[in-house]
């Protein structure tokens, strides 16, 4: 048995709004299924061996998206601890996306032009923020800082569909349901999605 608590109604327990789970473990041979109650108080009977992580809710919807075939692009080659500039200059001219918010993208400029997963690579840019404001970088114009990651795409149309999905009510619900630690979006989650995860 596993009960997930959202933190919204539990302030009287710890005097702070914090998410937590509680569970009951029995000393018996392993069961194949576990009763899980999510943040929306919906009950599910799940084989937890089939999950690398559990969403806080929208479990059925997200289960249909799993499949380990979404290619995530992430490394820290353009970490902002490395030498960079806030403005484009003669030496610092390669644009690297550091932040993405409602106002658009925040750029840092670096000297080196890395082409492994950054420049020249078609991708949809996402950020480790709580909320997502996806950017279709099909032309591979941008590198990514330690706060930004990419979803590999093959066509501009595929990127447009991913952006459309993540901006939809369903996409926002999926993103909101997959917050664990400090409400940031974990790029590892996308690696567990199937190739058609964004198809509504």
Label the model's feature ranges.
Residues 9-200:
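C-terminal substrate-recognition regions of SAM-dependent nucleic acid methyltransferases
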Residues 1-9:
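Conserved S-adenosyl-L-methionine
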């Amino acid at each position: 048995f596993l009960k997930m608590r959202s933190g919204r109604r539990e302030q009287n327990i710890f005097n702070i709004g914090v998410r937590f789970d509680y569970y009951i473990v029995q000393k018996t041979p392993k069961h194949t299924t576990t009763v899980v109650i999510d943040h929306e108080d919906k009950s599910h009977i799940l084989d937890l061996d089939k999950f690398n992580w559990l969403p806080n809710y929208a479990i059925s919807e997200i289960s249909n998206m799993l499949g380990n075939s979404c290619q995530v692009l992430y490394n820290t080659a353009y970490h902002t601890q490395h030498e960079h500039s806030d403005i484009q200059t003669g030496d610092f001219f390669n644009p690297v996306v550091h932040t993405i918010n409602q106002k658009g993208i925040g750029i840092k400029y670096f000297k080196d032009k890395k082409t492994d997963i950054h420049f020249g690579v078609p991708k949809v840019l996402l950020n480790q923020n709580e909320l997502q404001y996806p950017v279709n970088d099909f032309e591979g114009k941008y590198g990514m800082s330690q706060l930004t990651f990419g979803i590999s795409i093959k066509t501009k149309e595929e990127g447009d569909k991913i952006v459309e999905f993540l901006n939809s009510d369903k996409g926002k619900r999926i993103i909101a349901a997959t917050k664990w630690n400090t409400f940031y979006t974990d790029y590892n989650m996308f690696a567990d999605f199937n190739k058609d995860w964004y198809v509504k």
